[in-house]
Amino acid sequence: MNTTKRILAIQSSVCHGYVGNRAATFPLQLLGWDVDAIPTVELSNHAGYPIVKGRTLSAEQILDLYKGVSAANPSGYECLLTGYARGIGSVKAIMEIVRSVKSKNKKAFWVFDPVLGDNGRLYVEESIIPLYREMLPFADLITPNGFEAEILSGMRINSIDTAFKCVECLQQKYKVPRVVISSFVVEENGVEKLYCIGSSIYSKSFFVLIPVIPGIFRGTGDLFTALMAAHIAESPDCTESLASIKEDKLKKSVEMALSSVHEVIQKTADRISALGVEEYHPAYAELCIVNSQNSIIAPSKLFEAVYYY
C-alpha cells in the first residue's frame, strides 16, 4: 500500500525557470510528497523576461484537469496548495476544487498563497481581491507577502507592530487560523529591514529578521509556500487531522522554510557572481533549486524565530 503523502498544487507553470509549480514540485518531492500539479497558466518563462509566450487556462480547462487527476487518485489529498491564478473564472474554479478536495478528505490542509502582486504593483485584476477575501475563511494557512497582506486587510504596514496588527485583523475578520506574512520591508532608525512574521490561533506570534541578499530573484515566494506546506502538513501516518495541529509547528515550519529559501538564494547569488557577467539577464537569476537539494532537505543553518510577546 502506498503511504506517500499526496498534495495537489494549483498555480502557474513555466517551461523554463523556477516559479509557480516549477519552483514547488521538486522541493515537495524531495521532502516526501507525491505532487499532482494543475497549471492556471502555461508560459514559456516568467514575466521578468523580455519575451513571454504561452496561454491562460480557462476555468473549464482547470476543472477538467482536476476531474482527471481526481479520478486517477481516488484516495484524495492530504494537502492542497494554491497560488497564482489569472481571472475571476480561474479563481472560482480553484475554490470549487478546494471544496471538492475537502469534501473527500475533511483532514485536508489548504495552504493558500493569495498572489496579488508585490512592491506596490498588482499582478492580477482588482476584481479578484474580493474573491480572495471570501476564500480566506476556508484556508488553514495563508502566506501573503506584505503588499498582499495590506490589500487583504485594508491596513498599512510601516513597522513590525503594524504588521502584527494586520495579521490580527486577518485572523479576527476572516477567521484564518494561521497567517504568515512571508516578507515585508520596514525602516528602523534609517535602515531598511526585511522581516517574516507568523501567527497561529494555537500559539504565540513570532518574527524572523532576514539578512538581505542583493538581487532580483523570482519564485522565492512560491518556493517558500511550497516548503511551508511540506513542513506544516507533515504527519507520520496521515491519520491525525492536519487542520488541528496545535503545537508550535508553524514557528518551526517557518524557520525551516526560510532557512532553505535563504540558502537557495545565496547559491543563486554566488552563481551570478561566478559567471562574472556585465549585462544582466533574468536567466542568470533563476533559482538554483536542483543544486540546492541538501539545503531544501536540511538547511545547514536554521533561522531562529523570536516571539513577539
Curated annotation (Swiss-Prot):
It is found in: Cytoplasm; Nucleus. GO terms for biological process: pyridoxal 5'-phosphate salvage. ATP binds at residues 182-183, 209-221. It is an enzyme of class 2 (transferase). It catalyses: pyridoxal + ATP = pyridoxal 5'-phosphate + ADP + H(+). Its cofactor is a divalent metal cation. InterPro entries: PM/HMP-P_kinase-1 (IPR013749), PyrdxlKinase (IPR004625), Ribokinase-like (IPR029056). One of its GO terms (molecular function) is metal ion binding. GO terms for cellular component: cytosol; nucleus. Keywords: ATP-binding, Cytoplasm, Kinase, Metal-binding, Nucleotide-binding, Nucleus, Transferase, Zinc. Pfam families: Phos_pyr_kin. Substrate binds at residues 12, 123, 222. Belongs to the pyridoxine kinase family. Required for synthesis of pyridoxal-5-phosphate from vitamin B6. This is Putative pyridoxal kinase C6F6.11c. The lineage of its organism: Eukaryota, Fungi, Dikarya, Ascomycota, Taphrinomycotina.
